[in-house]
Amino acid sequence: GSEMCIRDSLLTIEQCNVVMIQECGQFILPAQHSGRYHYVVVEHAGAYNCRCNTCIIADLNFVASIHYLISGTGRSAICLNYNGCNIYTLHCESGSGAVGDIRDLVRHAVSPFIIGGDMNSTPSELSDNLRIMTTGTRSRPGNSAYFACCGMPTHISGRELDYFLIDSRLQLKTCVRGYHMKGGDHYPVILEI
């Protein structure tokens, strides 16, 4: 389907080191990529259909950890360490549930980190609800992150729902929207650090 075309384009044409896919269905990495890429798929807690899952693919062998968010939504996040940076991906609950999902993941992310996925809320909706994306206090600093967005709609609804939160210690090079492919309702977003 379209997910396979997008995935293959990101791996071969764009040469992405890490690819995050949400709602990937019964995902299996094709034989053409075996040996070069490794992946992990996790279902959301309470999910009863094959769409409710998240996948992360990387061009190196890795051990991923799965985080069940303490946000009341039952969502899961996958983390892998790539060259010293902890990369998390998730598919947030729609609407106000996204705030709890993101807040919990930023709070527990191990620095330096990148969080990316289908946030199901626009950056302004999240930042309005979260004010400044930080955790902790003056005497006990927590994590802080900034939004890395392409500034364009990433969903066929015309809203920007797919973007990244980046540890404040990391520097963004680019964040761009890829081209849309038939069958999917989201555009791929490509981040370079």
Question: Residue locations for each model-derived region?
Answer:
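Short active-site-proximal "capping" loops at secondary-structure junctions
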Residues: 24-28, 44-47, 90
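N-terminal, active-site-proximal structural segment of metallo-dependent hydrolase catalytic domains
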Residues: 1-34
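Loop/turn elements at helix/coil->beta-strand transitions in domains of secreted/extracellular proteins
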Residues: 14-18, 37, 85-86, 110-112
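Glycine-rich, phosphate-binding/catalytic loops in enzymes
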Residues: 31-39, 129-134
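Active-site regions of metal-assisted phosphoester/phosphodiester hydrolases
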Residues: 2-3, 7-8, 49-193
